[in-house]
């Protein structure tokens, strides 16, 4: 990580940009179902689009519109008639890969996150049916879909959607979050539009903020992953180990010895195990449809978005608040930067410093760590053995310098809003009880020596 940029792996970024923490691993979530028999009446709009394998239209692919669940990670939203919002309606692509969904669905709620999936079909005018085909595009809140919504589903939209949603995903029809982390799922769907333009099926997305970039290496990874999917999709299919395009992909995407049988599941396995079998990248030919591609095997298939601006300078600490905003402690600029869930530097209604050089209130001094309390205030450990509390809006700051703090290295906040600081300089722990007259306690002994981190046991 350079002193002027913050790089966040997409899979990790989704966790960091959520109201929850790093436990958002789709492979370890609860696979359950949210069943609704009487959906909220939000009329479905016409959806138009095309499905392509590489540059080749897919004819006869079956379209499904799915909604994300809310009863656990990897949960599915289900009507009594099935998991798809289209119910018994059958929508297939035509010879040009085109599809038209003419309002044959009802949004569960206006804010329910939805996504389109295309499976099967003929990947060319004379090609046989390929049942290994599975492509997708994350659309976002159901209520925002309109008659002008046009979707170009291909391998690029599939890679972007799967990688962004992988912490919440266990299968094609299983994307969901817990009842306490709806914001996290919202942020993940929004991240898709930073990676890809769903309307054109190309990198990068319209939501990529000013100052944020996809590196050449990340673009090459996306293209390579898309090419691996295309080698399977633009074929008659196959199984792991048969040497075909599908066979190579499914072999590389095995998890615990079990090979996938469709391209979305293969992509999901690779997203959730990004360091496994990366040598498959070398099987992509120079004539593959998505270029530029990788020329050698990467160390992993993680996707990185680089965020700059807002005063980011030698960042040392990062934390998220309850609405998904990311707070960054800038040791190089003695400031704190606040980014929204898409990485956009925030500017308060008063035009405060966050959009330029970051917040610098409360005598910030080479901050090294920070934590957010239940009210959204940021508590920042400074390099000069003090702690600064920054109000949630960034407009005011309060300096705390008691409790024998010495080179604080980490901050944590308990359920009673007490602030705990690990002091690496004198081998102690400081507790601050905020208030009009703050109270300080210092604890040493118990084998504490130069502590570098601190956490609270919620029990």
Please annotate each region the language model reported.
Residues 2-14:
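Bacterial N-terminal signal peptides that target proteins for export
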Residues 2-3, 85-87, 92, 329, ...:
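First exposed extracellular module after export/assembly in secreted or surface-exposed proteins
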Residues 13-21:
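Hydrophobic helical h-region of N-terminal Sec-dependent signal peptides
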Residues 23-26:
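C-terminal motif of bacterial Sec signal peptides marking the signal peptidase cleavage site
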Residues 31-144:
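Beta-strand-dominated extracellular/periplasmic modules and repeats
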Residues 64-70, 119, 232-235, 339, ...:
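Predominantly extracellular/luminal cell-surface or secreted proteins
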Residues 106-305:
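Mature extracellular/secreted ectodomains of secretory-pathway proteins
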Residues 282-459:
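Flexible "stalk/tail and boundary" regions
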């Amino acid at each position: 990580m350079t002193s002027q940029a913050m790089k966040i792996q997409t899979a990790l970024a989704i966790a960091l940009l959520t109201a929850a923490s790093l436990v958002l691993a789709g492979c370890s979530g609860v696979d359950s179902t949210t069943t609704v028999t009487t959906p909220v009446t939000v009329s479905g709009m016409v959806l138009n689009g095309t499905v392509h394998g590489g540059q080749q239209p897919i004819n006869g692919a079956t379209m499904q519109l799915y909604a994300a669940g809310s009863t656990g990670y990897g949960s599915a939203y289900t009507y009594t008639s099935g998991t798809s919002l289209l119910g018994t309606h059958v929508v297939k692509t035509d010879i040009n890969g085109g599809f038209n969904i003419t309002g044959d669905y009802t949004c569960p709620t206006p804010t329910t996150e939805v996504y389109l999936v295309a499976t099967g079909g003929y990947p060319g005018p004379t090609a046989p049916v390929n049942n290994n085909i599975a492509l997708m595009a994350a659309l976002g809140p159901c209520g925002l879909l309109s008659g002008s919504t046009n979707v170009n589903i291909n391998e690029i939209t599939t890679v972007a959607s799967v990688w962004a949603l992988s912490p919440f995903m266990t299968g094609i029809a299983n994307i969901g979050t817990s009842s306490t982390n709806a914001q996290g799922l919202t942020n993940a769907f929004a991240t898709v539009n930073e990676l890809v333009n769903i309307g054109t099926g190309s990198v990068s997305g319209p939501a990529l903020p000013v100052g944020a970039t996809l590196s050449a290496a990340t673009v090459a990874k996306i293209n390579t992953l898309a090419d691996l999917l295309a080698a399977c999709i633009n074929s008659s299919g196959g199984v792991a180990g048969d040497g075909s395009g599908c066979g190579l992909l499914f072999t590389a995407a095995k998890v615990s010895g079990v090979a996938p049988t469709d391209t979305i599941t293969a992509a999901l396995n690779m997203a959730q195990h990004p360091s496994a079998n990366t040598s498959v990248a070398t099987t992509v030919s120079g004539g593959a449809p998505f270029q530029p591609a990788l020329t050698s095997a990467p160390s992993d298939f993680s996707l990185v978005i680089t965020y700059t601006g807002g005063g980011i300078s030698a960042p040392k600490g990062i934390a998220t608040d309850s609405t998904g905003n990311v707070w960054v402690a800038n040791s190089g600029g003695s400031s704190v930067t606040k980014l929204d869930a898409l990485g956009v530097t925030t500017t308060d209604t008063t035009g405060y410093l966050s959009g330029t050089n970051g917040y610098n209130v409360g005598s910030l001094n080479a901050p090294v760590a920070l934590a957010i309390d239940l009210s959204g205030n940021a508590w920042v450990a400074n390099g000069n053995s003090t702690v600064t509390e920054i109000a949630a809006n960034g407009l005011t700051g309060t300096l705390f310098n008691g409790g024998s703090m010495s080179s604080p290295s980490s901050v944590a906040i308990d359920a009673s809003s007490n602030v705990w600081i690990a002091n690496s300089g004198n081998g102690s722990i400081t507790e601050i009880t905020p208030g009009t007259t703050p109270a300080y306690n210092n604890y040493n002994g118990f084998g504490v020596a130069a502590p570098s981190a601190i956490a609270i046991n919620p029990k």
